[in-house]
Amino acid sequence: MEPTNDAETLETQGEVTTAIWPSSQILKTTIDIPGTLSHDGRYIQYNLFGHIFELPAKYKPPIRPIGRGACGIVCSAVDSETNEKVAIKKITQVFDNTIEAKRTLREIKLLRHFDHENIVAIRDVILPPQRDSFEDVYIVNELMEFDLYRTLKSDQELTKDHGMYFMYQILRGLKYIHSANVLHRDLKPSNLLLSTQCDLKICDFGLARATPESNLMTEYVVTRWYRAPELLLGSSDYTAAIDVWSVGCIFMEIMNREPLFPGKDQVNQLRLLLELIGTPSEEELGSLSEYAKRYIRQLPTLPRQSFTEKFPNVPPLAIDLVEKMLTFDPKQRISVKEALAHPYLSSFHDITDEPECSEPFNFDLDEHPFSEEQFRELIYCEALAFNPETSND
Protein backbone atom coordinates (compact mmCIF):
# COMPACT_ATOMS: atom_id res chain seq x y z
CA MET A 1 0.00 0.00 0.00
CA GLU A 2 1.90 3.06 -1.27
CA PRO A 3 0.93 6.66 -2.06
CA THR A 4 0.78 7.74 -5.69
CA ASN A 5 3.82 9.43 -7.14
CA ASP A 6 2.07 12.79 -6.80
CA ALA A 7 1.43 12.36 -3.08
CA GLU A 8 4.34 14.19 -1.55
CA THR A 9 5.75 13.18 1.80
CA LEU A 10 5.26 15.39 4.84
CA GLU A 11 8.31 17.47 5.56
CA THR A 12 10.27 17.15 8.78
CA GLN A 13 11.05 20.72 9.71
CA GLY A 14 14.19 20.92 11.86
CA GLU A 15 13.72 20.06 15.52
CA VAL A 16 9.94 20.54 15.51
CA THR A 17 8.38 17.92 17.74
CA THR A 18 4.70 17.20 17.24
CA ALA A 19 2.28 15.46 19.56
CA ILE A 20 1.59 11.90 18.53
CA TRP A 21 -1.33 11.57 20.91
CA PRO A 22 -4.54 13.60 21.22
CA SER A 23 -3.26 16.72 22.94
CA SER A 24 -4.21 20.23 23.89
CA GLN A 25 -0.69 21.61 23.97
CA ILE A 26 2.53 20.84 22.11
CA LEU A 27 5.75 20.76 24.06
CA LYS A 28 8.97 21.37 22.19
CA THR A 29 12.31 20.57 23.72
CA THR A 30 15.66 19.21 22.70
CA ILE A 31 16.96 19.13 26.29
CA ASP A 32 17.80 15.70 27.66
CA ILE A 33 15.92 15.04 30.90
CA PRO A 34 18.13 13.57 33.66
CA GLY A 35 16.91 10.46 35.49
CA THR A 36 16.99 9.20 39.08
CA LEU A 37 17.26 5.50 39.90
CA SER A 38 14.39 3.89 41.83
CA HIS A 39 13.38 0.41 43.00
CA ASP A 40 16.94 -0.92 43.25
CA GLY A 41 17.86 0.50 39.87
CA ARG A 42 15.16 -1.43 37.99
CA TYR A 43 13.30 1.79 37.21
CA ILE A 44 14.37 5.35 36.45
CA GLN A 45 12.33 8.43 37.32
CA TYR A 46 12.26 11.40 34.95
CA ASN A 47 10.71 14.76 35.83
CA LEU A 48 9.02 16.13 32.72
CA PHE A 49 7.75 19.60 33.59
CA GLY A 50 6.49 18.45 36.97
CA HIS A 51 5.19 15.10 35.72
CA ILE A 52 7.10 12.10 37.05
CA PHE A 53 7.64 9.28 34.55
CA GLU A 54 8.85 6.07 36.20
CA LEU A 55 10.17 3.82 33.45
CA PRO A 56 12.00 0.49 33.37
CA ALA A 57 15.70 0.86 32.70
CA LYS A 58 15.30 -0.58 29.19
CA TYR A 59 13.73 2.72 28.07
CA LYS A 60 16.73 4.90 27.37
CA PRO A 61 17.29 8.63 26.75
CA PRO A 62 16.63 10.87 25.11
CA ILE A 63 13.41 11.03 27.17
CA ARG A 64 11.49 13.97 25.78
CA PRO A 65 7.97 15.34 26.28
CA ILE A 66 6.11 15.45 22.98
CA GLY A 67 2.53 16.21 23.95
CA ARG A 68 0.17 17.04 26.75
CA GLY A 69 -3.53 16.28 27.01
CA ALA A 70 -6.24 15.49 29.51
CA CYS A 71 -4.48 12.29 30.55
CA GLY A 72 -1.14 13.99 31.23
CA ILE A 73 2.20 14.03 29.46
CA VAL A 74 3.31 11.86 26.55
CA CYS A 75 7.02 11.31 26.11
CA SER A 76 9.28 9.68 23.57
CA ALA A 77 12.06 7.27 24.46
CA VAL A 78 14.21 4.55 22.92
CA ASP A 79 13.56 0.88 23.65
CA SER A 80 17.11 -0.40 24.10
CA GLU A 81 16.04 -4.00 23.43
CA THR A 82 14.74 -3.21 19.94
CA ASN A 83 16.43 0.17 19.32
CA GLU A 84 12.99 1.51 18.35
CA LYS A 85 11.77 4.99 19.21
CA VAL A 86 8.49 4.72 21.10
CA ALA A 87 5.77 6.94 22.52
CA ILE A 88 4.89 6.44 26.18
CA LYS A 89 1.53 7.71 27.42
CA LYS A 90 1.14 8.08 31.17
CA ILE A 91 -2.47 7.83 32.35
CA THR A 92 -2.58 9.24 35.86
CA GLN A 93 -4.77 8.20 38.78
CA VAL A 94 -6.47 5.54 36.68
CA PHE A 95 -8.44 4.03 39.54
CA ASP A 96 -9.97 7.24 40.89
CA ASN A 97 -13.14 6.28 39.00
CA THR A 98 -14.32 3.12 37.30
CA ILE A 99 -15.02 4.88 33.98
CA GLU A 100 -11.35 5.80 33.52
CA ALA A 101 -10.18 2.38 34.68
CA LYS A 102 -12.54 0.60 32.28
CA ARG A 103 -11.57 2.90 29.42
CA THR A 104 -7.87 2.23 29.99
CA LEU A 105 -8.34 -1.54 30.20
CA ARG A 106 -10.55 -1.53 27.10
CA GLU A 107 -7.99 0.38 25.07
CA ILE A 108 -5.16 -1.96 26.08
CA LYS A 109 -7.20 -5.05 25.20
CA LEU A 110 -8.32 -3.61 21.87
CA LEU A 111 -4.81 -2.63 20.82
CA ARG A 112 -3.57 -6.11 21.73
CA HIS A 113 -6.39 -7.63 19.66
CA PHE A 114 -5.75 -5.50 16.57
CA ASP A 115 -2.95 -6.04 14.06
CA HIS A 116 -3.26 -3.68 11.11
CA GLU A 117 -1.06 -1.22 9.24
CA ASN A 118 -3.52 1.63 9.77
CA ILE A 119 -3.98 1.13 13.52
CA VAL A 120 -1.32 2.29 15.96
CA ALA A 121 0.60 -0.68 17.36
CA ILE A 122 0.96 -1.26 21.08
CA ARG A 123 4.48 -2.24 22.14
CA ASP A 124 4.22 -2.58 25.90
CA VAL A 125 2.24 -1.90 29.04
CA ILE A 126 4.90 -1.05 31.59
CA LEU A 127 4.84 -3.44 34.52
CA PRO A 128 4.21 -1.41 37.70
CA PRO A 129 6.90 -1.74 40.39
CA GLN A 130 4.24 -2.58 43.00
CA ARG A 131 1.39 -4.88 42.03
CA ASP A 132 -1.18 -3.91 44.66
CA SER A 133 -0.79 -0.16 44.97
CA PHE A 134 0.04 1.43 41.59
CA GLU A 135 -2.14 4.34 40.47
CA ASP A 136 -0.69 5.25 37.06
CA VAL A 137 -0.59 3.24 33.85
CA TYR A 138 2.00 3.62 31.07
CA ILE A 139 1.06 2.48 27.56
CA VAL A 140 3.89 2.22 25.03
CA ASN A 141 3.14 2.60 21.32
CA GLU A 142 5.09 2.94 18.13
CA LEU A 143 6.18 6.54 17.63
CA MET A 144 4.59 8.58 14.87
CA GLU A 145 5.95 11.99 13.92
CA PHE A 146 2.71 13.95 13.53
CA ASP A 147 -1.01 13.91 14.11
CA LEU A 148 -3.50 15.19 11.56
CA TYR A 149 -4.85 17.93 13.85
CA ARG A 150 -1.44 19.59 14.21
CA THR A 151 -0.67 19.08 10.54
CA LEU A 152 -3.87 20.88 9.54
CA LYS A 153 -2.99 23.73 11.91
CA SER A 154 0.53 24.03 10.48
CA ASP A 155 1.85 25.62 7.30
CA GLN A 156 2.55 22.16 5.84
CA GLU A 157 1.21 21.96 2.29
CA LEU A 158 -1.33 19.21 1.67
CA THR A 159 -2.29 18.36 -1.90
CA LYS A 160 -5.48 16.74 -3.18
CA ASP A 161 -3.48 13.51 -3.45
CA HIS A 162 -2.66 13.74 0.24
CA GLY A 163 -6.37 14.03 0.97
CA MET A 164 -7.20 11.02 -1.18
CA TYR A 165 -4.47 8.88 0.39
CA PHE A 166 -5.44 9.86 3.93
CA MET A 167 -9.11 9.09 3.20
CA TYR A 168 -8.16 5.68 1.82
CA GLN A 169 -6.05 4.77 4.84
CA ILE A 170 -8.70 5.87 7.35
CA LEU A 171 -11.29 3.72 5.59
CA ARG A 172 -8.87 0.80 5.27
CA GLY A 173 -8.24 0.85 9.02
CA LEU A 174 -11.92 1.36 9.77
CA LYS A 175 -12.88 -1.65 7.67
CA TYR A 176 -10.68 -3.79 9.92
CA ILE A 177 -12.06 -2.20 13.09
CA HIS A 178 -15.69 -2.67 12.04
CA SER A 179 -14.99 -6.27 10.99
CA ALA A 180 -14.06 -6.94 14.63
CA ASN A 181 -17.56 -5.72 15.59
CA VAL A 182 -16.05 -2.56 17.06
CA LEU A 183 -17.10 1.06 16.61
CA HIS A 184 -14.35 3.62 17.21
CA ARG A 185 -16.82 6.35 18.26
CA ASP A 186 -14.25 9.14 18.56
CA LEU A 187 -12.72 9.67 15.13
CA LYS A 188 -11.21 13.15 14.78
CA PRO A 189 -7.99 14.63 13.36
CA SER A 190 -6.06 14.36 16.64
CA ASN A 191 -6.77 10.61 16.73
CA LEU A 192 -5.13 10.09 13.34
CA LEU A 193 -1.35 9.78 13.49
CA LEU A 194 0.94 10.45 10.53
CA SER A 195 4.49 9.62 9.53
CA THR A 196 6.78 11.66 7.30
CA GLN A 197 5.95 9.15 4.54
CA CYS A 198 2.21 9.93 4.84
CA ASP A 199 1.41 6.64 6.55
CA LEU A 200 -1.71 7.07 8.70
CA LYS A 201 -2.70 5.17 11.82
CA ILE A 202 -5.86 5.37 13.91
CA CYS A 203 -5.38 5.68 17.67
CA ASP A 204 -7.26 6.21 20.96
CA PHE A 205 -9.78 3.39 21.41
CA GLY A 206 -10.88 4.31 24.92
CA LEU A 207 -14.43 5.10 23.76
CA ALA A 208 -14.72 2.12 21.40
CA ARG A 209 -17.75 -0.15 21.79
CA ALA A 210 -19.34 -3.21 20.27
CA THR A 211 -21.61 -2.87 17.26
CA PRO A 212 -25.38 -2.65 17.84
CA GLU A 213 -25.94 -6.02 19.51
CA SER A 214 -24.61 -4.38 22.68
CA ASN A 215 -26.97 -2.61 25.07
CA LEU A 216 -24.22 -0.29 26.30
CA MET A 217 -24.49 2.41 23.68
CA THR A 218 -25.51 5.47 25.69
CA GLU A 219 -22.17 6.82 26.96
CA TYR A 220 -20.89 10.14 25.58
CA VAL A 221 -19.32 9.60 22.17
CA VAL A 222 -17.59 11.53 19.41
CA THR A 223 -16.24 15.05 19.68
CA ARG A 224 -19.11 17.38 18.73
CA TRP A 225 -17.78 18.61 15.37
CA TYR A 226 -17.59 15.06 14.02
CA ARG A 227 -20.83 13.78 15.54
CA ALA A 228 -23.46 12.21 13.29
CA PRO A 229 -27.00 13.68 13.34
CA GLU A 230 -28.46 10.58 15.01
CA LEU A 231 -26.11 11.16 17.95
CA LEU A 232 -26.96 14.85 18.13
CA LEU A 233 -30.62 13.82 18.33
CA GLY A 234 -30.08 11.40 21.20
CA SER A 235 -30.22 8.03 19.46
CA SER A 236 -28.85 5.20 21.62
CA ASP A 237 -29.04 2.40 19.03
CA TYR A 238 -26.59 3.87 16.53
CA THR A 239 -24.46 1.79 14.17
CA ALA A 240 -21.08 1.80 12.41
CA ALA A 241 -22.52 4.60 10.27
CA ILE A 242 -21.51 7.11 12.97
CA ASP A 243 -17.85 6.46 12.16
CA VAL A 244 -18.51 6.96 8.44
CA TRP A 245 -20.04 10.38 9.13
CA SER A 246 -16.93 11.34 11.12
CA VAL A 247 -14.67 10.31 8.23
CA GLY A 248 -16.66 12.50 5.84
CA CYS A 249 -16.21 15.49 8.16
CA ILE A 250 -12.49 14.80 8.56
CA PHE A 251 -11.92 14.49 4.82
CA MET A 252 -13.58 17.82 4.10
CA GLU A 253 -11.47 19.40 6.84
CA ILE A 254 -8.34 18.06 5.12
CA MET A 255 -9.43 19.47 1.76
CA ASN A 256 -10.52 22.88 3.10
CA ARG A 257 -8.10 23.27 6.06
CA GLU A 258 -10.98 24.18 8.36
CA PRO A 259 -13.63 22.16 10.24
CA LEU A 260 -16.75 21.43 8.24
CA PHE A 261 -19.20 21.83 11.13
CA PRO A 262 -17.54 23.82 13.97
CA GLY A 263 -20.62 23.93 16.19
CA LYS A 264 -20.51 26.03 19.37
CA ASP A 265 -22.92 23.71 21.15
CA GLN A 266 -25.25 20.79 20.44
CA VAL A 267 -28.03 22.95 18.98
CA ASN A 268 -25.67 24.99 16.81
CA GLN A 269 -23.98 21.80 15.62
CA LEU A 270 -27.26 20.40 14.29
CA ARG A 271 -28.10 23.75 12.71
CA LEU A 272 -24.78 23.86 10.83
CA LEU A 273 -25.12 20.40 9.33
CA LEU A 274 -28.76 20.96 8.33
CA GLU A 275 -27.75 24.22 6.63
CA LEU A 276 -25.50 22.13 4.38
CA ILE A 277 -27.37 18.86 3.84
CA GLY A 278 -30.87 20.31 4.19
CA THR A 279 -33.86 19.44 6.36
CA PRO A 280 -34.50 15.68 6.23
CA SER A 281 -37.68 14.28 4.72
CA GLU A 282 -40.17 12.29 6.78
CA GLU A 283 -38.68 9.13 5.29
CA GLU A 284 -35.17 10.18 6.34
CA LEU A 285 -36.30 10.73 9.92
CA GLY A 286 -36.71 6.96 9.93
CA SER A 287 -36.09 5.32 13.29
CA LEU A 288 -35.49 8.49 15.31
CA SER A 289 -37.50 8.84 18.49
CA GLU A 290 -40.80 10.71 18.34
CA TYR A 291 -39.23 13.48 20.43
CA ALA A 292 -36.39 13.87 17.91
CA LYS A 293 -38.84 13.89 15.00
CA ARG A 294 -40.94 16.61 16.66
CA TYR A 295 -37.80 18.65 17.29
CA ILE A 296 -36.74 18.48 13.63
CA ARG A 297 -40.25 19.31 12.40
CA GLN A 298 -40.41 22.50 14.45
CA LEU A 299 -37.14 23.82 12.99
CA PRO A 300 -37.18 26.14 9.95
CA THR A 301 -37.05 24.19 6.69
CA LEU A 302 -33.61 24.46 5.13
CA PRO A 303 -32.76 23.63 1.48
CA ARG A 304 -29.86 21.37 0.64
CA GLN A 305 -26.81 23.26 -0.63
CA SER A 306 -24.82 22.20 -3.65
CA PHE A 307 -21.59 20.62 -2.41
CA THR A 308 -20.02 21.24 -5.81
CA GLU A 309 -20.72 24.98 -5.66
CA LYS A 310 -19.81 25.37 -2.00
CA PHE A 311 -16.55 23.40 -2.30
CA PRO A 312 -15.24 24.10 -5.83
CA ASN A 313 -11.70 23.01 -4.87
CA VAL A 314 -12.82 19.45 -4.07
CA PRO A 315 -12.77 17.01 -7.04
CA PRO A 316 -16.21 15.93 -8.31
CA LEU A 317 -15.65 12.25 -7.50
CA ALA A 318 -14.63 13.18 -3.96
CA ILE A 319 -17.77 15.30 -3.63
CA ASP A 320 -19.87 12.32 -4.72
CA LEU A 321 -18.28 10.10 -2.06
CA VAL A 322 -18.60 12.71 0.69
CA GLU A 323 -22.26 13.32 -0.11
CA LYS A 324 -22.86 9.60 0.39
CA MET A 325 -21.02 9.74 3.73
CA LEU A 326 -22.83 12.83 4.97
CA THR A 327 -26.32 11.42 4.50
CA PHE A 328 -28.78 12.23 7.28
CA ASP A 329 -30.34 8.76 7.45
CA PRO A 330 -27.71 6.32 8.76
CA LYS A 331 -29.44 3.46 6.95
CA GLN A 332 -28.83 5.24 3.64
CA ARG A 333 -25.25 6.27 4.48
CA ILE A 334 -22.52 4.52 2.51
CA SER A 335 -20.70 1.72 4.34
CA VAL A 336 -16.93 1.55 4.75
CA LYS A 337 -16.64 -1.31 2.26
CA GLU A 338 -18.75 0.58 -0.28
CA ALA A 339 -16.68 3.72 0.26
CA LEU A 340 -13.43 1.84 -0.38
CA ALA A 341 -14.87 0.63 -3.69
CA HIS A 342 -15.95 4.13 -4.74
CA PRO A 343 -14.37 5.38 -8.01
CA TYR A 344 -12.67 8.26 -6.17
CA LEU A 345 -10.39 5.73 -4.44
CA SER A 346 -9.85 3.45 -7.45
CA SER A 347 -6.12 4.23 -7.65
CA PHE A 348 -5.65 2.73 -4.16
CA HIS A 349 -8.47 0.23 -3.75
CA ASP A 350 -7.38 -3.40 -3.72
CA ILE A 351 -9.76 -5.73 -1.91
CA THR A 352 -6.99 -8.30 -1.48
CA ASP A 353 -4.95 -5.74 0.48
CA GLU A 354 -7.76 -4.54 2.75
CA PRO A 355 -7.81 -7.21 5.46
CA GLU A 356 -10.50 -7.84 8.02
CA CYS A 357 -10.00 -8.90 11.62
CA SER A 358 -9.85 -12.67 12.01
CA GLU A 359 -12.22 -12.71 14.99
CA PRO A 360 -14.56 -10.27 16.73
CA PHE A 361 -13.41 -8.47 19.84
CA ASN A 362 -14.94 -9.64 23.11
CA PHE A 363 -16.44 -6.78 25.14
CA ASP A 364 -17.24 -8.94 28.18
CA LEU A 365 -15.44 -6.55 30.52
CA ASP A 366 -18.20 -3.98 29.93
CA GLU A 367 -20.71 -6.39 31.46
CA HIS A 368 -19.00 -6.62 34.87
CA PRO A 369 -19.01 -4.06 37.71
CA PHE A 370 -15.36 -4.55 38.67
CA SER A 371 -14.00 -3.03 41.86
CA GLU A 372 -10.91 -0.81 41.98
CA GLU A 373 -8.82 -3.75 43.18
CA GLN A 374 -10.11 -5.95 40.35
CA PHE A 375 -9.35 -3.33 37.70
CA ARG A 376 -5.86 -2.91 39.14
CA GLU A 377 -5.24 -6.66 38.95
CA LEU A 378 -6.64 -6.92 35.40
CA ILE A 379 -4.40 -4.12 34.13
CA TYR A 380 -1.41 -5.63 35.95
CA CYS A 381 -2.10 -8.92 34.15
CA GLU A 382 -2.13 -7.07 30.82
CA ALA A 383 1.28 -5.63 31.66
CA LEU A 384 2.48 -9.09 32.69
CA ALA A 385 1.47 -10.44 29.28
CA PHE A 386 4.03 -8.08 27.72
CA ASN A 387 6.62 -8.86 30.39
CA PRO A 388 6.19 -12.58 31.21
CA GLU A 389 9.67 -12.95 32.69
CA THR A 390 9.11 -10.18 35.23
CA SER A 391 6.73 -10.07 38.17
CA ASN A 392 6.77 -7.33 40.80
CA ASP A 393 4.67 -9.07 43.44
Curated annotation (Swiss-Prot):
SUPFAM superfamilies registered for this protein in UniProt: Protein kinase-like (PK-like)
Binding site residues for ATP: 66-74, 89
A Pfam family recorded for this sequence: Pkinase
Location of the Protein kinase domain: 60-345
Taxonomic path: Eukaryota, Viridiplantae, Streptophyta, Embryophyta, Tracheophyta
Record key words, sorted: ATP-binding, Kinase, Nucleotide-binding, Phosphoprotein, Serine/threonine-protein kinase, Transferase
Disulfide partners: none
Active site: 186
EC class name: transferase
Xref: PANTHER family: MITOGEN-ACTIVATED PROTEIN KINASE
GO biological process, one term: auxin transport
Sequence motif TXY, residues: 218-220
Domain remarks in the Swiss-Prot or TrEMBL record: The TXY motif contains the threonine and tyrosine residues whose phosphorylation activates the MAP kinases.
Listed GO MF terms: ATP binding; MAP kinase activity; protein serine kinase activity
Residues where Phosphothreonine is found: 218, 223
Complex and partners: Interacts with MKK2.
The protein, known as: Mitogen-activated protein kinase 10
EC number of the protein: 2.7.11.24
Origin species: Arabidopsis thaliana (Mouse-ear cress)
